[in-house]
């Protein structure tokens, strides 16, 4: 077999292995009558212009009351409608996911942080053809896949939306889906301050997907989980004090 053909075949095989459809789905294909222990949370990420930085903070975080129990968490993405190349999208999402795994192994405000104990996210991100209407807006759309797509959310001023489902009895996250709004231009904001930075926003949304809520204190503006963003922002790419405290509270330190 030609080396290039073999390489292409191998990559396709690896992507197929990463597909969430191969994961046992305890809660897949639920009907429209929501099971009593299954709860939905929708996080809406609004745009807000950059404000003057307030005084320093010591680390805000908010837990939603559920977390993943099995790892790694698989991701899939449909890069169509993004206006970006598939390679760029995969790389940006991969870097966002890795930030929650390792947080760049930093020393910050006297806190030595070396990531969390489990390897949270699968390093391989699958490609899907699912769209906005295929996401788990209702329980009958649950499929065990954590899907990222671009779409037009009906409310103005919304950058992204994360839909999360969890089991109230076991406090276990079942699935999350992310919509990145097509009202905005997406790219690398270090090369253009008028765009929404893909890595920046996805890092925030993945925080919801693994169990963290938004924080809105004015002094929490440096946190990845601060609930507002703006075009050109890149600070959410890097976890801050509260983000690291929160994720360590959920999953333990490495």
Language model regions located:
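Short acidic/polar beta-strand-loop edge motifs in secreted extracellular
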Residues: 84-85, 89, 235
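Metzincin-family zinc-dependent endopeptidase catalytic domain
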Residues: 92-203, 209, 213
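Metalloprotease/metallohydrolase-associated module, dominated by Zn2+-dependent proteases
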Residues: 20, 25, 29, 166-189, ...
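A broad, low-specificity signal marking well-ordered, structured residues that form hydrophobic/aromatic
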Residues: 73-75, 146, 178, 223
